[in-house]
A protein has these predicted regions:
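Phosphate- and other anionic-substrate recognition elements at nucleic-acid/protein interfaces
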Residues: 1-163
Length: 163
Protein backbone atom coordinates (compact mmCIF):
# COMPACT_ATOMS: atom_id res chain seq x y z
CA UNK A 1 0.00 0.00 0.00
CA UNK A 2 0.91 3.63 -0.19
CA UNK A 3 0.59 6.18 -2.96
CA UNK A 4 3.34 4.53 -5.02
CA UNK A 5 2.17 0.96 -4.40
CA UNK A 6 1.65 -1.64 -7.12
CA UNK A 7 -0.74 -4.49 -7.73
CA UNK A 8 0.72 -7.59 -9.40
CA UNK A 9 -0.75 -10.80 -10.72
CA UNK A 10 1.02 -14.09 -11.27
CA UNK A 11 -0.31 -17.41 -12.53
CA UNK A 12 -0.58 -20.58 -10.45
CA UNK A 13 2.65 -21.84 -12.04
CA UNK A 14 4.49 -18.67 -10.95
CA UNK A 15 4.67 -16.92 -14.31
CA UNK A 16 4.18 -13.17 -14.39
CA UNK A 17 0.78 -12.06 -15.75
CA UNK A 18 0.69 -8.29 -15.25
CA UNK A 19 1.24 -5.40 -12.85
CA UNK A 20 0.42 -1.72 -12.58
CA UNK A 21 0.48 1.09 -10.01
CA UNK A 22 -2.53 1.10 -7.69
CA UNK A 23 -3.10 4.83 -8.13
CA UNK A 24 -3.01 6.52 -11.53
CA UNK A 25 -2.16 9.93 -10.08
CA UNK A 26 -0.37 9.94 -6.73
CA UNK A 27 -1.22 13.59 -6.14
CA UNK A 28 -4.99 13.08 -6.41
CA UNK A 29 -6.38 9.77 -5.18
CA UNK A 30 -9.70 9.25 -6.96
CA UNK A 31 -11.42 6.29 -5.29
CA UNK A 32 -13.97 5.71 -8.07
CA UNK A 33 -11.29 5.75 -10.76
CA UNK A 34 -9.04 3.52 -8.63
CA UNK A 35 -11.85 1.02 -7.97
CA UNK A 36 -12.69 0.88 -11.68
CA UNK A 37 -9.03 0.36 -12.59
CA UNK A 38 -8.67 -2.45 -10.04
CA UNK A 39 -11.88 -4.09 -11.30
CA UNK A 40 -10.51 -3.92 -14.85
CA UNK A 41 -7.20 -5.36 -13.60
CA UNK A 42 -8.85 -8.56 -12.28
CA UNK A 43 -11.56 -8.81 -14.96
CA UNK A 44 -11.34 -12.08 -16.87
CA UNK A 45 -9.10 -13.74 -14.26
CA UNK A 46 -9.95 -16.15 -11.49
CA UNK A 47 -8.20 -14.56 -8.53
CA UNK A 48 -7.54 -17.30 -5.99
CA UNK A 49 -6.05 -15.17 -3.23
CA UNK A 50 -4.75 -11.65 -2.71
CA UNK A 51 -1.90 -10.74 -0.38
CA UNK A 52 -1.93 -7.25 1.11
CA UNK A 53 0.98 -5.84 3.06
CA UNK A 54 -0.03 -5.26 6.68
CA UNK A 55 1.65 -1.90 7.23
CA UNK A 56 1.59 0.58 10.08
CA UNK A 57 2.47 4.25 10.42
CA UNK A 58 6.13 5.11 10.91
CA UNK A 59 7.21 6.63 14.19
CA UNK A 60 7.92 10.32 13.77
CA UNK A 61 5.65 10.83 10.76
CA UNK A 62 3.47 13.91 10.66
CA UNK A 63 -0.22 13.64 11.50
CA UNK A 64 -1.15 14.52 7.91
CA UNK A 65 1.31 11.99 6.48
CA UNK A 66 0.09 9.28 8.84
CA UNK A 67 -3.56 9.97 7.98
CA UNK A 68 -2.86 9.92 4.22
CA UNK A 69 -0.82 6.73 4.55
CA UNK A 70 -3.58 5.02 6.54
CA UNK A 71 -6.24 6.16 4.08
CA UNK A 72 -4.30 4.93 1.04
CA UNK A 73 -3.23 1.67 2.67
CA UNK A 74 -6.88 0.67 3.18
CA UNK A 75 -7.71 0.86 -0.53
CA UNK A 76 -6.52 -2.67 -1.47
CA UNK A 77 -8.34 -4.24 1.49
CA UNK A 78 -11.58 -2.40 0.75
CA UNK A 79 -11.32 -3.38 -2.89
CA UNK A 80 -10.87 -7.07 -2.05
CA UNK A 81 -13.76 -6.97 0.41
CA UNK A 82 -16.12 -5.27 -2.04
CA UNK A 83 -15.06 -7.48 -4.98
CA UNK A 84 -15.43 -10.63 -2.87
CA UNK A 85 -11.79 -11.64 -3.28
CA UNK A 86 -10.17 -13.76 -0.58
CA UNK A 87 -7.19 -11.97 0.94
CA UNK A 88 -4.65 -12.14 3.73
CA UNK A 89 -2.72 -9.27 5.29
CA UNK A 90 0.94 -10.12 5.83
CA UNK A 91 3.47 -8.04 7.82
CA UNK A 92 6.47 -6.93 5.72
CA UNK A 93 9.01 -8.77 7.88
CA UNK A 94 7.15 -12.05 7.38
CA UNK A 95 7.03 -12.05 3.57
CA UNK A 96 10.48 -10.44 3.31
CA UNK A 97 12.12 -13.10 5.50
CA UNK A 98 10.75 -15.76 3.16
CA UNK A 99 11.30 -14.03 -0.18
CA UNK A 100 14.76 -12.64 0.66
CA UNK A 101 16.16 -16.11 1.49
CA UNK A 102 19.45 -16.67 -0.29
CA UNK A 103 19.95 -12.95 -0.96
CA UNK A 104 23.16 -11.47 0.40
CA UNK A 105 22.31 -8.73 2.88
CA UNK A 106 22.52 -5.24 1.38
CA UNK A 107 23.04 -2.39 3.82
CA UNK A 108 22.75 1.37 3.80
CA UNK A 109 23.64 4.14 6.21
CA UNK A 110 20.55 5.83 7.64
CA UNK A 111 22.53 8.76 9.05
CA UNK A 112 23.21 7.26 12.47
CA UNK A 113 23.85 3.57 11.83
CA UNK A 114 24.07 0.92 9.14
CA UNK A 115 20.76 -0.85 8.45
CA UNK A 116 19.49 -3.53 6.09
CA UNK A 117 18.35 -2.07 2.74
CA UNK A 118 15.20 -4.14 2.22
CA UNK A 119 14.23 -2.13 -0.88
CA UNK A 120 17.37 -3.15 -2.75
CA UNK A 121 17.10 -6.70 -1.44
CA UNK A 122 13.54 -6.92 -2.80
CA UNK A 123 14.73 -5.77 -6.22
CA UNK A 124 17.47 -8.43 -6.21
CA UNK A 125 14.99 -11.13 -5.10
CA UNK A 126 12.41 -10.11 -7.72
CA UNK A 127 15.06 -10.22 -10.47
CA UNK A 128 16.02 -13.76 -9.38
CA UNK A 129 12.46 -15.07 -9.31
CA UNK A 130 11.17 -13.09 -12.31
CA UNK A 131 14.27 -12.61 -14.52
CA UNK A 132 12.27 -11.59 -17.61
CA UNK A 133 10.17 -8.91 -15.87
CA UNK A 134 11.28 -5.29 -16.07
CA UNK A 135 10.82 -3.63 -12.69
CA UNK A 136 10.63 -0.14 -14.18
CA UNK A 137 7.56 1.87 -13.14
CA UNK A 138 7.16 3.15 -16.73
CA UNK A 139 8.92 2.65 -20.06
CA UNK A 140 10.73 5.95 -19.45
CA UNK A 141 11.94 5.05 -15.94
CA UNK A 142 15.67 4.60 -15.50
CA UNK A 143 15.66 2.76 -12.17
CA UNK A 144 13.91 -0.35 -10.94
CA UNK A 145 10.92 0.37 -8.71
CA UNK A 146 11.05 -1.25 -5.26
CA UNK A 147 7.25 -0.94 -4.98
CA UNK A 148 6.86 -3.07 -8.12
CA UNK A 149 9.40 -5.57 -6.73
CA UNK A 150 7.57 -5.77 -3.40
CA UNK A 151 4.25 -6.34 -5.15
CA UNK A 152 5.65 -9.18 -7.23
CA UNK A 153 7.29 -10.79 -4.21
CA UNK A 154 4.06 -10.60 -2.20
CA UNK A 155 2.19 -12.22 -5.11
CA UNK A 156 4.78 -15.01 -5.15
CA UNK A 157 4.57 -15.33 -1.37
CA UNK A 158 0.80 -15.72 -1.71
CA UNK A 159 1.19 -18.31 -4.46
CA UNK A 160 3.52 -20.37 -2.26
CA UNK A 161 1.47 -20.14 0.93
CA UNK A 162 -2.21 -19.80 -0.07
CA UNK A 163 -2.88 -22.36 -2.80
Amino acid sequence: PGTKGFVSMIAEDGTFVKAEPIFKDIKVVDMIETANRLLAFVEGYEVRHAVIEDVHALYGSSAKGTFTFGYNSCVPEFFCAIAGLPYTKIPPKKWQSDMHKGIKMVTKNDGTKTVKDVKKMSIVAAHRIFPDVSLKRTNRSLKDDDNFADSLLMAEYGRRHFK
